[in-house]
UniProtKB/Swiss-Prot annotation:
Keywords: Cytoplasm, Hydrolase, Metal-binding, Nickel. The keyword Hydrolase applies. It is found in: Cytoplasm. NCBIfam families: PRK13206.1 (NF009685), PRK13207.1 (NF009686), urease_alph (TIGR01792). It holds the Pfam family Amidohydro_1. This is Urease subunit alpha. The gene is ureC. Its EC number is 3.5.1.5. It comes from Allorhizobium ampelinum (strain ATCC BAA-846 / DSM 112012 / S4) (Agrobacterium vitis (strain S4)).
Length: 570
């Protein structure tokens, strides 16, 4: 006679199973388990009197025989491809299997072999996501990296050299000398890092030397002069060397309007930063570019989501970040031209329908590096409350909306920047850059962050206590963040061209240098998973009202948000 358990008892012991629903933090977002890859009655679980013991759930297999290095048991995976319950097997710092873990000598259907050399991470009742990627980083201070890691980010792409005024305003590392220093500095950090060179030039020579010097992308920024000539030149170099181009267009419309920038792009693939415009770009209608099939549009998180405080904080932020003076009327006019409640409200809806593809931070330069996940899920929650369930949802859940929003800071930036063969999702063969969450703290405070299969960060109690949990509990680096484990657990992404000319040997860095690939004609807006809509966008030049395919896009600002003061004292 099979043993029967109530759903509540089963979920308490092994985590939710098919058909069970889980609330994400304090939002109105509810996910439903679509499939359970574990086997009822043969689940593996670690602990006293539990299954993963010698001769039971643990086999005699050696590592050579196929035993994994780490098993995450009974995890609820939330990814762009599905919301499923499964065990996850990690080996050599990569995901090698998703399915049923255990001992094949005593259990059927095992595709993840647990052996004496296998570590166990208890995933029961936990959510596992791919590590987040922030593709809009101003490398103003190295302390950003710890902040990002502790929030669940495992890859940061952008530019800068520290608190130089060029870096305070623009996301680029100018010149091969600075790029080399940043790649060397990357060895010190438990984080996958990637650096963009400056893309503003009318002749290719200086851009080519940056790509050959290790830049994995080129950034066009209006503060360096984003003219049609610079746009064309930069994209031509990118096409030759297979690196992505990110663009921040001309707010003042000095060298042309949005149509001129679209013309200069000539249908080539490009990542458009803060496409709404508050972060910069042709005023007031840069948002129109999100309807172009070759443009990958993204947001930075200060405008995510639209709240009663959004407009008020932006003016001061903008004055500081772009080296403007409140005593110069032209500087104030420049700042005010970028801040429009109508386009910010429309941005919420464009994210919800999948027309904006990526959310990033704009770290310390009109953005908060530790709030990429929080702002993403706050936007999703606001849209559910204001717009209801997505028409594409099936069942009494928010699975489709959750898949759409998690893709915005995991797989889609990875695809856009040529990293998706390594990171961005929980798939076999990819790096084991994973984040484990308690559902009540989902998107806010991770339980554990893994880099290349090693635990790099986690909340930890008093090190002198008799158990790990006594106060003060706060985030601390773990062993994966120290010594050679740090440089063996994370990587630096560069151009293939730089590797071909011997960059690794020339710099002698400890981290592995990996090449970006397929950033040009092989991808487009259509490549953005769950976020590929290309509506025709119109902006009224006087009222700033935004329409998509003729429909007015507007919503009220939020007065209260989830994932906020309930979780933070400060």
């Amino acid at each position: 006679m099979p043993f029967k358990m109530s759903r509540a008892a089963y979920a308490s012991m092994f985590g939710p199973t098919t058909g069970d629903k889980v609330r994400l933090a304090d939002t109105e977002l509810f996910i439903e388990v679509e499939k359970d890859f574990t086997h009822y009655g043969d689940e593996v679980k670690f602990g006293g009197g539990k299954v993963i013991r010698d001769g039971m759930g643990q086999s005699q297999a050696t590592r050579v025989d196929g035993a994994v290095d780490t098993v995450i048991t009974n995890a609820l995976i939330v990814d762009h491809w599905g919301i499923v319950k499964a065990d996850i097997g990690l080996k050599d710092g990569r995901i090698v299997a998703i399915g049923k873990a255990g001992n094949p000598d005593t259990q059927p259907g095992v595709n993840i072999i647990v052996g004496p050399g296998t570590e166990a991470i208890a995933g029961e009742g936990k959510i596992v996501t791919a590590g987040g990627m922030d593709s809009h980083i101003h490398f103003i201070c190295p302390q950003q990296i710890e902040e990002a890691l502790m929030s669940g980010l495992t890859c940061m792409l952008g530019g800068g050299t520290g608190p130089a005024h060029g870096t305070l305003a623009t996301t680029c590392t100018p010149g091969p000398w600075h790029i080399a220093r940043m790649i060397e500095a990357a060895d010190a950090f438990p984080m996958n890092l990637a650096f963009a060179g400056k893309g503003n030039a009318s002749l290719p020579g200086a851009l080519e030397e940056m790509v050959l010097g290790g830049a994995c992308a080129l950034k066009l920024h209006e503060d360096w002069g984003t003219t049609p000539g610079a746009v064309d030149c930069c994209l031509s170099v990118a096409d030759d060397y297979d690196v992505q181009v990110m663009i921040h267009t001309d707010t003042l419309n000095e060298s042309g309007f949005v149509e001129d920038s679209i013309g200069a792009i000539k249908g080539r693939t490009i990542h458009a930063f803060h496409t709404e415009g508050a972060g910069g770009g042709h005023a007031p209608d840069i948002i129109k570019i999100c309807g172009q099939p070759n443009v990958i549009p993204s947001s930075t998180n200060p405008t995510r989501p639209y709240t009663i405080n959004t407009l008020a904080e932006h003016l001061d932020m903008l004055m500081v970040c772009h080296h403007l003076s409140p005593s110069i009327p032209e500087d104030i006019a420049f700042a005010e031209s970028r801040i429009r409640k109508e386009t910010i409200a429309a941005e919420d809806i464009l994210h919800d329908i999948g027309a904006f593809s990526i959310i990033s931070s704009d770290s310390q330069a009109m953005g908060r590096v530790g709030e990429v996940a929080i702002r993403t899920w706050q936007t999703a929650d606001k849209m559910k409350r204001q717009r209801g369930r997505l028409p594409s949802e099936t069942g009494e859940n928010d699975n489709m909306r959750v898949k759409r929003y998690i893709a915005k800071y995991t797989i889609n930036p990875a695809i856009a920047h040529g990293l998706s063969h390594e990171i961005g999702s929980i798939e076999i063969g990819k790096r084991a850059d994973l984040v484990i969450w308690n559902p009540a703290f989902f998107g806010v405070k991770p339980d554990m962050v893994l880099l290349g299969g090693s635990i790099a960060a986690a909340p930890m109690g008093d090190p002198n206590a008799s158990i790990p949990t006594p106060q003060p509990v706060h985030y601390r680096h773990m062993f994966g963040a120290y010594g050679k484990a740090r440089t063996n657990s994370s990587v630096t992404f560069v151009s293939q061209a730089s590797l071909d000319v011997g960059l690794a040997a020339r710099l002698g860095v400890s981290k592995q240098l990996l090449a970006v690939k397929n950033t040009r004609g092989g991808i487009s807006k259509a490549s953005m998973i769950h976020n590929s809509l290309t509506p025709h966008i119109e902006v009224d030049p006087e009222t700033y009202e935004v329409r998509a395919d003729g429909e007015l896009l507007t919503c009220e600002p939020a007065t209260v948000l989830p994932m906020a003061q309930r979780y933070f004292l400060f």
